[in-house]
């Protein structure tokens, strides 16, 4: 019988090599998975996939000469783990893109400023001109009824207009608030996130008017003239000169805020701070 000792030693050495590779794989996987939130991070899952690919290649190179049962089992185990994480990453990417597309379609199909008030978050109590016609009629009827104390039962029997007899009034489940000294019930105004900003953006995009009111700006100019010059009290300024000053001042302010906003964006912030304006002055307004 031939001596099988070298073959046994070679098999044992191969098994030890596989064991060392698996121990290093376990250590590296623990290093990646110990980071909090690695499951929700694409970078963490990609690192784990790269580690599994690397050790899979090492096992295949180590078993290139002789495929034993241990090699085949370990290679299948590492390959299965790698495939699981690849599938998980692909599913997460698909879900992310699906949610993004759904949000884009929802945003394109609805208008935040002109759309209907389906969530009862928009209030029409800040002016009668912005109030729907049916609510305007209801509020006027309530005021007439509350102010006129001589109304009899005949006036309470039904509305004076027969066309409005079958229409129901506003829901009693709406949140209302009573103001002191007033008989009319007003609702608290609430905005959805981003709705007020969209209204202001569309307002300033459609108009070419000045941003500052003319009367306060004119008072400010006259006050500066009176306090800064010895003969300011006797001076008079034309309206077109005030308009020119206002246009120049607003152009300067808009340019300054644009530059400061770029500086805050460069600092990876969305909030404009005083340090951004100071840095803009140092960079672009050295003469001031």
Curated annotation (Swiss-Prot):
Consequence of gene loss (knockout): RNAi-mediated knockdown impacts chromosome segregation leading to abnormal chromatin distribution. Disrupts mel-28 localization to kinetochores. Leads to cleavage furrow regression and failed cytokinesis during the second embryonic division. RNAi-mediated knockdown abolishes the localization of hcp-6 at the centromeres of mitotic chromosomes.
A matching Pfam family: Histone
Record region (H3-like): 191-288
Induction record: Present at higher lower (>95%) level than cpar-1 (at protein level).
Location relative to the cell: Nucleus; Chromosome, Centromere; Chromosome, Centromere, Kinetochore
Entry's Gene Ontology molecular function annotations: DNA binding; protein heterodimerization activity; structural constituent of chromatin
Highest rank taxon of the organism: Eukaryota
Keyword RNA-binding included in the entry's annotation: no
Region (Disordered): 96-194
InterPro entries assigned to the protein according to its UniProt record, in alphabetical order: Histone-fold, Histone_H2A/H2B/H3, Histone_H3/CENP-A
The keyword Nucleus appears for this protein: yes
Record's keyword terms, sorted: Centromere, Chromosome, DNA-binding, Kinetochore, Nucleosome core, Nucleus
GO biological process assignments: embryo development ending in birth or egg hatching; establishment of protein localization to chromosome; kinetochore assembly; mitotic cell cycle; mitotic sister chromatid segregation; mitotic spindle assembly; mitotic spindle organization; negative regulation of mitotic centrosome separation
Task performed by this protein: Histone H3-like variant which exclusively replaces conventional H3 in the nucleosome core of centromeric chromatin at the inner plate of the kinetochore. Required for recruitment and assembly of kinetochore proteins, mitotic progression and chromosome segregation. May serve as an epigenetic mark that propagates centromere identity through replication and cell division. Might promote cleavage furrow stability during cytokinesis. Not required for chromosome segregation during meiosis.
Family, per entry: Belongs to the histone H3 family.
Protein known as: Histone H3-like centromeric protein hcp-3
Species this protein is from: Caenorhabditis elegans
